[in-house]
Design a protein with these regions (language model features):
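Substrate-binding pocket helix/loop in short-chain dehydrogenase/reductase
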Residues: 87-88, 95-97
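Conserved glycine-rich Rossmann-like NAD(P)H-binding loop of the short-chain dehydrogenase/reductase
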Residues: 21-37
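Active-site helix of classical SDR
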Residues: 111, 148
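Canonical Rossmann dinucleotide-binding motif of NAD(H)/NADP(H)-dependent dehydrogenases/reductases
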Residues: 1-26
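Residue(s) in the substrate-gating loop at a strand-loop-helix junction
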Residues: 132
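The beta1-alpha1 cofactor-binding region of Rossmann-like NAD(H)/NADP(H)-dependent oxidoreductases
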Residues: 32-33, 51-61, 93
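SDR active-site lid
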Residues: 165-237
């Protein structure tokens, strides 16, 4: 059993929940010490592997270590993510590349190096990719993040359809967190040093606003229940709250009217 991006918050909660279900867990995070701390809390057979999911060689090494250590992988959770806010035209190309490198190519790398081997096992399994409610309901001053999460959602759709087309026993779902404490607003800690610190007013304002919303949201410890229930029931879309259904519906109604959808309104 394997997961990617489990060092903090809801990733760690899901890792611990899977372990409680009797699964052997590989904890992966760009911060090796954080991954090791999660593995230590889990105990038993859990192992930690420091991995930058934006680096294909690192994800390939993660896959090799996971399969070599446990023999097979049944659940893959592509969860690593970063937040980059700000006005679309104010963001540097490097900001866009960094955001997509983790939020989109991190998932692509996981699919590339894990899924073929999971299919070859000819056993039941599941891939869960983390997108966001922002994939449906966007907001201003969050362009890189929102666009990357839309891509993550579409990538998950393509994966699910491809797996179905070949008759695979592997299922695919997309987790769409809303306002709960994912830690996504504090990803400046893993921002590459060559990008420098983001001190632009547009970026700082939206990051501060996002953190306030997350602080008042549901605790990360509640992430596991929708995650495991979604896998068990074969749901493609795994929301962490049902309360965004109306906003999702409003989005598509606006599009049918050829209008710009409204912004996300936290509840």
């Amino acid at each position: 059993r394997d997961r990617a991006g489990v060092g903090r918050r809801h990733g760690a909660a899901v890792a611990e929940g899977l372990a409680n279900e009797g699964m052997r867990v590989v904890c992966s995070d760009i911060d090796g010490q954080t991954a090791e701390a999660t593995a230590a809390r889990i105990g038993g057979d859990a192992i930690a592997v420091a991995t930058d999911v934006a680096d294909p060689a690192a994800v390939e090494a993660l896959a090799n270590q996971s399969f070599d250590h446990f023999g097979q992988v049944d659940v893959l959770f592509n969860n690593a993510g970063v937040f980059q806010g700000g006005l679309a035209w104010e963001r540097s190309l490097e900001d866009w590349h960094w955001t997509f490198g983790v939020n989109v190519f991190g998932i692509i790398h996981g699919i590339k190096y894990f899924v073929p081997r999971m299919i070859a096992q000819e056993t039941d399994g599941h891939v869960v990719n983390t997108a966001s409610v922002a994939a449906f309901v966007a907001g201003a001053t969050s362009g890189p993040y929102v666009v990357s999460k839309c891509a993550a959602f579409s990538l998950s759709e393509s994966l699910a359809l491809d797996l179905g087309a070949v008759g695979s026993k592997i299922g695919a779902s997309v987790l769409t967190p809303s306002t709960f404490d994912t830690g996504i607003a504090k990803t400046a800690r893993v921002r590459p040093s060559h990008l420098g610190e983001d001190k632009t007013p547009d970026g700082l304002v939206v990051a501060e606003y996002l953190q306030k919303q997350l602080d008042s949201g549901m605790p990360a410890s509640e992430a596991f229940t929708p995650f495991i229930n979604g896998i068990r029931t074969g749901e493609f879309l795994i929301p962490t709250k049902p309360s965004y259904a109306d906003q999702i519906r409003n989005r598509y109604e606006a599009l049918l009217k050829r209008q710009i959808p409204g912004q996300l309104v936290p509840d």
